[in-house]
């Protein structure tokens, strides 16, 4: 039988501590050579409000209102500016497999996005065009022993947890053991998850500063997480104020414009960045130790062939050639920019922090093995707890030779 899970059941199946442990185990296997990932591939094709409205069967002048209201009804948020930038259809894939657990995972995302300028910064926005203001993004788990389809689940909960749990693993091995103060840029799901995951590996955290451009959002975020964690969490008025005088600096934004500046980082700080482009070159230059989740992620911007020539210029530039320059800090593990891989760090093949004064920098990029790690743990726990709905595996099999 093949198990079908929804996001509520996924959340019930696993704790954040289990996510951190599963990610750590997976990257140890990566370092040992017994787990694999494919590069994340994004494929971009222009679409439009007119085309979306026509397919949804509504007047185009009602599209924005419909989507924004449907999201607000779910206490979720879409930047209104997202509709003012050119719209792009994006199909994204990631793959990973772990020999030890016998799990292979494929993540597929079929979505509409745009890149508006919000508060002077280029943002990455996903627009929920599915029924009820929802997204279409799935994870399929396969047996790496028999090839059979084991489970299908949405990726929303795992998407957040695989990123923040990986960041927490980096923090566990790179941040100072006596870290007490955290600064966070962002007030969305990644920021909240980063608080939860960081507390798993550094339970002694006493003070957290938060900045995001929307004052209303950051105040609500701080209030919610202060109540949930019982920790001294405060909202501050600038990115600089959030990053000054902290032991752990976390970027959890959706911007491609540098907002975390190396000049603000004190000696001894650990930087955990979740979004390509949110840190400036000074962060890379000042770091004594740089670790990337997975090297191959740094090459995904070379994939010119996956952006249609007719795509808006901003998308072509962002997703093809922007970071190809040989002297770019995104050309990782070069003599100018030496970088370790997280798996090698965990497997003892690369050095981490050796001094309390060092600045360490975890470039927390994507790797498909994250989905195999968390997906496998969720499947294991869901079966034990009786979560989800089973359907016949026969539905997904064929007699013809593929």
What are these regions (language model features)?
Residues 1-168, 178, 369-372, 389, ...:
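N-terminal ligand-binding/catalytic initiation module
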Residues 7-10, 283-402:
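Adenosine-phosphate binding glycine-rich loop
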Residues 155-159, 273-279, 365-368:
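Glycine-rich phosphate/pyrophosphate-binding beta-alpha loops
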Residues 174-181, 204, 266-267:
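Short helix-loop-beta connector
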Residues 187-188:
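Glycine-rich Rossmann-fold phosphate-binding loop(s) that bind the pyrophosphate
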Residues 191-192:
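N-terminal Rossmann-fold NAD(P) dinucleotide-binding loop
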Residues 201-226:
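NAD(P)-binding Rossmann-fold cofactor-contacting core
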Residues 230-325:
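Rossmann-like adenosine-cofactor binding region
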């Amino acid at each position: 039988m093949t198990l079908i899970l929804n996001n509520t059941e996924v959340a019930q199946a696993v704790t954040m501590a289990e996510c951190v442990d599963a990610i750590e185990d997976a990257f140890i296997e990566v370092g040992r050579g017994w787990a694999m990932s494919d590069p994340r591939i994004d494929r971009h094709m222009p679409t439009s409000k007119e085309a979306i409205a026509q397919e949804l069967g509504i007047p185009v002048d009602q599209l924005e209102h419909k989507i924004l209201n449907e999201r607000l009804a779910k206490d979720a948020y879409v930047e209104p500016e997202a509709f003012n930038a050119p719209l792009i259809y994006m199909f994204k894939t990631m793959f990973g497999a772990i020999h030890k657990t016998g799990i292979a995972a494929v993540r597929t995302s079929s979505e509409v996005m745009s890149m508006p300028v919000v508060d002077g910064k280029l943002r990455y926005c996903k627009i929920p065009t599915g029924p009820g203001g929802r997204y279409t993004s799935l994870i399929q788990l396969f047996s790496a022993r028999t090839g059979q389809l084991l489970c299908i689940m949405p990726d929303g909960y795992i998407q957040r947890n695989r990123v923040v749990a990986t960041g927490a693993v980096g923090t566990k091995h790179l941040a100072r053991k006596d870290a007490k103060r955290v600064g966070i840029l962002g007030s969305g799901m990644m920021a909240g998850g980063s608080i939860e995951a960081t507390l798993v590996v550094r339970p002694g955290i006493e003070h957290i500063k938060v900045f995001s451009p929307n004052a209303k959002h950051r105040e609500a975020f701080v209030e919610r997480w202060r109540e949930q964690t019982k920790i001294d969490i405060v909202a501050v008025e600038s990115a600089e104020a959030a990053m000054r005088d902290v032991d752990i600096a976390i970027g959890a934004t959706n911007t491609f414009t540098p907002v975390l500046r190396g000049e603000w980082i004190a000696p001894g700080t650990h930087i955990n960045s979740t979004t390509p482009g949110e840190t400036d070159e000074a962060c890379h230059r000042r770091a004594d130790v740089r670790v990337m989740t997975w090297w191959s992620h740094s090459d995904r911007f070379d994939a010119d062939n996956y952006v249609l020539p007719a795509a808006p210029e901003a998308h072509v530039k962002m997703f093809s050639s922007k970071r190809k320059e040989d002297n770019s800090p995104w050309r990782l593990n070069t003599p100018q920019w030496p970088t370790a891989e997280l798996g090698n760090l965990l497997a003892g093949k690369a050095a981490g922090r050796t001094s309390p004064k060092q600045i360490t920098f975890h470039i927390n990029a994507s790797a498909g093995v994250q989905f195999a790690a968390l997906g496998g743990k969720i499947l294991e726990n869901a079966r034990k707890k009786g979560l989800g709905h089973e359907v016949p595996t026969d539905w997904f099999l064929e007699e013809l030779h593929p």
